[in-house]
């Protein structure tokens, strides 16, 4: 899966660079090269499994260097998220178990409303989005994972431990970009850790019954199956 997206982003970069030989305007060529660098960098990030490409800090912010150098991709990420919110008409988050919430990256009003009346622990699995300022509290943990990829086993273990350490005392919100893949994988891992006899497919169905939009790819399912073997 990583290689697939690496190839796609690299091909887009190659097409943009090829366009430099077609357009005559120097400004258009410069723009093509600028956007191509963004896509090529993202392609390499997927090829070598490097979420640090986005330069997301532990406190949930993204460096100014990343925002400037990869502005076309940041803009594309936000456009994709806002378009998905508008078209899918899905609730931003769902309570899977008491105090355990699974959802997408919240926009400002949603985040303020969710965190307003009670203490919240936030597990942020996005590498490509800065966390909303309302959710970057003292109980915040960022485990940056590239979109459409699976958490490593040590990341799953860390995520499960974070959820377990907070769930008895406060609401825990686990999210990725859309709340369908990376975050669903982590929530499933926590559920599997609580019931060591439950099979992966049953846990996925349990989550899907509450948040129908989830969908784990083959890499994410493989990570869960390996997690079950090691638990």
How does the language model describe each region?
Residues 3, 15-16, 38-40, 100, ...:
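Generic detector of intrinsically disordered, low-complexity, polar/charged segments
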Residues 78-172, 190-228:
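Cysteine-based protein phosphatase catalytic domain of the PTP/DSP
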Residues 36, 118, 178-180, 195:
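Glycine-centered secondary-structure boundary/capping sites
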Residues 170-188:
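A phosphate-binding catalytic loop at a beta-strand-loop-alpha-helix junction
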Residues 1-85:
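N-terminal membrane-anchoring alpha-helices
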């Amino acid at each position: 899966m990583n290689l697939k997206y690496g190839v796609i982003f690299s091909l887009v970069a190659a097409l943009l660079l090829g366009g430099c030989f077609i357009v005559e305007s120097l400004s258009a060529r410069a723009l093509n090269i600028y956007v191509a660098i963004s896509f090529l960098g993202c392609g390499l990030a997927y090829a070598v499994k490097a979420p640090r490409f986005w330069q997301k800090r532990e406190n949930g912010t993204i460096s100014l260097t990343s925002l400037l150098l990869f502005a076309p991709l940041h803009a594309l990420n936000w456009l994709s998220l806002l378009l998905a919110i508008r078209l899918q008409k899905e609730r931003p988050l769902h309570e899977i178990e008491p105090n355990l919430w699974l959802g997408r990256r919240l926009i400002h009003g949603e985040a303020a409303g969710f965190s307003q009346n009670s203490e919240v622990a936030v597990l942020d699995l996005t590498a490509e989005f800065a966390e909303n300022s309302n959710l970057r509290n003292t109980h915040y943990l960022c485990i940056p994972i590239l979109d459409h990829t699976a958490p490593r086993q040590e990341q799953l273990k860390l995520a499960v431990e974070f959820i377990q350490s907070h769930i008895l005392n406060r609401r825990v919100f686990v999210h990725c970009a859309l709340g369908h893949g990376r975050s669903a994988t982590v929530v499933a891992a926590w559920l599997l850790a609580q019931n060591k006899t439950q099979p992966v497919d049953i846990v996925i169905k349990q989550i899907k019954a509450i948040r129908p939009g989830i969908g784990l790819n083959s890499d994410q399912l493989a990570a869960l199956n390996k997690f079950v073997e090691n638990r």
